[in-house]
Swiss-Prot record:
One of its GO terms (biological process) is proton motive force-driven ATP synthesis. InterPro entries: ATP8_metazoa, ATPase_protein_8. The keyword Mitochondrion applies. It is a single-pass membrane protein. It is found in: Mitochondrion membrane. The chain crosses the membrane at residues 6-26. This is ATP synthase protein 8. F-type ATPases have 2 components, CF(1) - the catalytic core - and CF(0) - the membrane proton channel. One of its GO terms (molecular function) is proton transmembrane transporter activity. Pfam families: ATP-synt_8. GO terms for cellular component: mitochondrial membrane; proton-transporting ATP synthase complex. Keywords: ATP synthesis, CF(0), Hydrogen ion transport, Ion transport, Membrane, Mitochondrion, Transmembrane, Transmembrane helix, Transport. Mitochondrial membrane ATP synthase (F(1)F(0) ATP synthase or Complex V) produces ATP from ADP in the presence of a proton gradient across the membrane which is generated by electron transport complexes of the respiratory chain. F-type ATPases consist of two structural domains, F(1) - containing the extramembraneous catalytic core and F(0) - containing the membrane proton channel, linked together by a central stalk and a peripheral stalk. During catalysis, ATP synthesis in the catalytic domain of F(1) is coupled via a rotary mechanism of the central stalk subunits to proton translocation.
Length: 55
């Protein structure tokens, strides 16, 4: 019975688990946490009045 021979599918199983446990989380985390927040300054900018050219 060829399905009981672990040689052909065991390597695929091991390498796929290595991919899911080691490589994939690094790639997912780079997409989830790529927007690092920056500290805002304490001084608020003054709002500029709108300049409507047709008035």
């Amino acid at each position: 019975m060829p399905q009981l021979n672990p040689h052909p599918w065991f390597a695929i199983l091991v390498f796929s688990w290595i991919f899911f446990l080691v490589i994939l989380p690094k790639k997912v985390m780079t997409h989830l946490f790529n927007n690092n927040p920056t500290a805002k300054s304490a001084e608020k900018p003054k709002p500029e009045p709108w300049n409507w050219p047709w008035t």
